[in-house]
Amino acid sequence: MKRFINSTVTFSVTVTIAVIIFFLLSPVTSLGSGSTYAVVYGSDTVCALISGQPTQRILCYDTRLNINVTLNPGVSFSSIAAGDNFLCGIRSGGYSLLCWDNIGSYSPNRKRIYQNDNVLLETLSVGDKQICATVNGTNSLKCWRGSVSDQSKPPNERFRSISSGVGFSCGVSIRNNRILCWGTDPVKSNQIQTGFGNTPMVTISAGKSHACGLNTTGNLICIGNNDSGQLNVIAPDQPNLYSSSLSLGSNFTCAMRISNNSVVCWGGGAERFNNVTDSISFESISSGPGLICGLISSNLSIMCWNPTNFSRIFLPFPEVLPGPCVESSSSSLCSCGVYPQSDKLCSGTGSICKSCPIQFPASPPSQFPLPPPPPPPPPSPSTSSPPSKALTRGLLAFAIVGSVGAFAGICSVVYCLWTGVCLGKKKVHNSVQPTITRGGSNSRSNSSNSRSLSIRRQGSRMLSMRRQRSGTSSMKHADKAEEFSFSELASATGNFSLENKIGSGSFGVVYRGKLNDGREVAIKRGEVNAKMKKFQEKETAFDSEIAFLSRLHHKHLVRLVGYCEEREEKLLVYDYMKNGALYDHLHDKNNVEKHSSLINSWKMRIKIALDAARGIEYLHNYAVPPIIHRDIKSSNILLDSNWVARVSDFGLSLMGPVLGKDHNPYQRPTKAAGTVGYIDPEYYSLNVLTDKSDVYGLGVVLLELLTGKRAIFRNNGDVEEEEGCVPVHLVDYSVPAITADELSTILDPRVGSPELGEGDAVELVAYTAMHCVNAEGRNRPTMTDIVGNLERALDLCGDSHGSISSGICSIVSD
């Protein structure tokens, strides 16, 4: 029995320790993360915290002018980080944050950014303009400067690691280990956050326009701009090769090897000099846009080099602190021990904690270890001492608790695997389980070779997690949107000339414009002389668009640039979508054959459908609170210069259903609104709104993509007429053909018959569309199910990465 207890205790303790060590992360040093030294952008000045003195002061050295500058000689700091010609430092104790502007001059200007004796700062992150820090104990986030206020960062998030680049900051959320990004450049922030997706991460480091980090399996992942090869990780598939000490510059990435603490770099030609740094062991590394520096372990000196020509220099600093000095009373909290000679380095004022190496939890065993053979009979009770009994009881209790915890963990893993794998075998909807049976030709239609293709759920829960996108922020207008004057927008549109008119929206006319800074935008102007009812509708639509779009940021939603509200004038400014609306391409009278339009391919149409579905899925599942668009139609799906589809026009949008007391979605009673042909019949007749109303609208759009016909059209045999004949609803026209396995009879002839591999994809889209337009909302799939099916359809087209190439452009769907 004792051997079994010891075995179980050992297993439980091992699992417990692995989980604990997993979260003991060593500090990350990069272009935008706090450390004991930093490289200032734009001036090639390096600043460091000097050791061996009563105060851990900041000493800076200008590598171009060869001069030293001391900042606040009588003040101790725990960490510093640099931005564009400025430096910031957290004072020892974390109660104050100071910054110096014009750091390259002889007399930098000092400013106190933060002071609070109760809420202490811990981790510092500085980008080109923005400054962020986490709060000690809570890991909540505070940000300053660069228009990155507390309102623009992810709300109510706690971070275990943060880092800042040029125009963006990113962090690893404690809640789910996902990467969240924010900043003054929402396009770059969203690109990087989207690139990481739902990959569980443990560290993050930012460069000028890319970011890298270690995932939970120990692999290094880099996302963002790759124009110089800075994302081309050396040995990316080899786990536990690199430590958490990463350093990213403008066009290069550097990392430290776990094996010998040497530095390896790639991108911008930096890899040419890896053989020079192979023999040097570093404590950490830090970078500016064009300069790499490392703290050498043997003598705590700083060596810097240029990644393009390896012109290295050794900075004339005394020994530099390898980590912050903590009070001696706190040194007992150093989980991985105290750094050698800490007393000397901190001049008797404290100790330096060693950085803990990141340990990644091994895959849990498939079953509990088998108990060993029965032990020999225990000694008689008279020979057992009371302490041994107590110890045995304690070990037994610990073993039981540990075993229960381990068993619960294994059950969770098994459940996740079961739902992820087995859900893939379920149909799109439990209540409707269609099967597509298709023969190769009429002569073979009844043969045993006909095969079935089921619409699968694709483990929608797992897929949904992989597709999670950026969160929302404040509801206030000015947090994200610029305010323009009416004269600015009038000038941008040629005084709203007819030649600049490109369409109309929920409350006005849309014009193409060009702002003074050269940005191309779309400007929606509300009707000025509207009747009272129309005026109230315009007010509501205007307020809705600002309220929603100012806090929504997603690749597949049209971005609100700003607004204007002067007297009765109400205008909204959006990113200009160069390729217009999907409706215009599908129903253009000049689009008469396959080569008339780039969208006349099944792969392209499925890709556009997937883009739009991802935007709607974000509104339903990840916006807080959820949002129901209410007007999904092909004219509200716009295409940017790269043919990426984005959902637009939120004038009719409403906050979506929330969970009621019975944990079922609450259906919001509201007056029906939308566009004829796309409006949900259940919503129209019952005035009850749910997110399934958007699903219906998307289903009609899918049918448009398949057939090339309008939502309501006049049908004269195989010819669609503008006048005459009886109006036909696209749903009534398409669904019977799909149900009767006659899909080929309604497909858009301009695209032609599906090529090899596309047939199954088109059928999957057709059956997905059929379920989307089911008369009863409860029988329609969720947006997560739809996205999963469209992703699979795009894969079936022979492109697992969702990329579509043509002679004109290259399109990538993430």
Swiss-Prot record:
It catalyses: L-seryl-[protein] + ATP = O-phospho-L-seryl-[protein] + ADP + H(+); L-threonyl-[protein] + ATP = O-phospho-L-threonyl-[protein] + ADP + H(+). GO terms for molecular function: ATP binding; protein homodimerization activity; protein serine kinase activity; protein serine/threonine kinase activity. Belongs to the protein kinase superfamily. Ser/Thr protein kinase family. This is Putative serine/threonine-protein kinase-like protein CCR3. GO terms for cellular component: membrane. Residues 496-794 form the Protein kinase domain. The lineage of its organism: Eukaryota, Viridiplantae, Streptophyta, Embryophyta, Tracheophyta. The active site is at D631. Residues 1-30 form the signal peptide. Gene3D superfamilies: Phosphorylase Kinase, domain 1, Regulator of chromosome condensation 1/beta-lactamase-inhibitor protein II, Transferase(Phosphotransferase) domain 1. Residues 366-388, 433-478 are annotated as: Disordered. The chain crosses the membrane at residues 394-414. It is found in: Membrane. Homodimer. Serine/threonine-protein kinase.
